[in-house]
Amino acid sequence: MKVIASSLRKGNVVDIDGRLYVVLTAQNFHPGKGTPVTQVDMRRISDGTKVSERWKTTEQVERATVDEREYDFLYEDGEGYHFMEPVSYDQVVVSPDVVGDGKVFLTEGMRVYLQTHNDVAISIEFPQKVTVEITETEPVVKGQTASSSYKPAMCTNGLRVMVPPHISAGTRIVINTEDLSYVERAKD
């Protein structure tokens, strides 16, 4: 199915010259002079090579048809990451290349969307928000309330996020998986 380049989003799968690529990032640029362009960073599914492309925003790109289904994360071992389809209980092993940087979000039982093409896993869509626990934060400096001040914090999964001053070690927070930003204090 042909789509215009400006409509490409992270996780989309495109077909270029018979090869499939997963979109990692897509940004639209509108220079003051000249034609608007879409800068797309992609990963070739066959060998994991990262590629950068630049298209005019109105240019047509072939979007591949993929099967997308819900899976639950089970565990990780030397083979890869194991997921189970909750209805049929079919299990699938996904390579670390496909999981990518999202591995830090995976927790046992987490529901994700797994995209497949010809029964081969090509990309994973994680929930937009996940709950993590803070292991350590820097102390708050009194008197810095004139502007919104955030402080760095380390999470149990190894991520560093910026959090408001009232968040301390042991607090569970919700973060956005796309930009690793603090959303709110967990309500549990």
From Swiss-Prot:
Q: Which domain of life is it from?
A: Bacteria
Gene3D superfamilies associated with the record: 2.30.30.30, Nucleic acid-binding proteins
Which UniProt keyword terms apply here? Answer: Cytoplasm, Elongation factor, Protein biosynthesis
Principal place of residence:
cytoplasm
Give the metabolic or biological pathway. Protein biosynthesis; polypeptide chain elongation
Q: Where in the cell is it found?
A: Cytoplasm
Give the molecular function GO annotations.
translation elongation factor activity
The record's section on SMART domains has:
EFP, Elong-fact-P_C
* Keyword Oxidoreductase (UniProt): no
Q: Which InterPro entries match?
A: Elong-fact-P_C, NA-bd_OB-fold, Rib_uL2_dom2, Transl_elong_fac_P/YeiP, Transl_elong_KOW-like, Transl_elong_P/YeiP_cen, Transl_elong_P/YeiP_CS, Transl_elongation_fac_P
The record's annotation in PROSITE patterns points to:
EFP
**Record keyword Cytoplasm present:** yes
Cellular component terms per the entry's GO annotation: cytoplasm
> What Pfam families does the entry give?
EFP, EFP_N, Elong-fact-P_C
Q: Which GO terms describe its biological process?
A: peptide biosynthetic process
Record's family? Belongs to the elongation factor P family.
Q: What does this protein do?
A: Involved in peptide bond synthesis. Stimulates efficient translation and peptide-bond synthesis on native or reconstituted 70S ribosomes in vitro. Probably functions indirectly by altering the affinity of the ribosome for aminoacyl-tRNA, thus increasing their reactivity as acceptors for peptidyl transferase.
Q: Which PANTHER family match?
A: ELONGATION FACTOR P, TRANSLATION ELONGATION FACTOR KOW-LIKE DOMAIN-CONTAINING PROTEIN
Q: What is this protein called?
A: Elongation factor P
Q: Which organism is it from?
A: Cereibacter sphaeroides (strain KD131 / KCTC 12085)
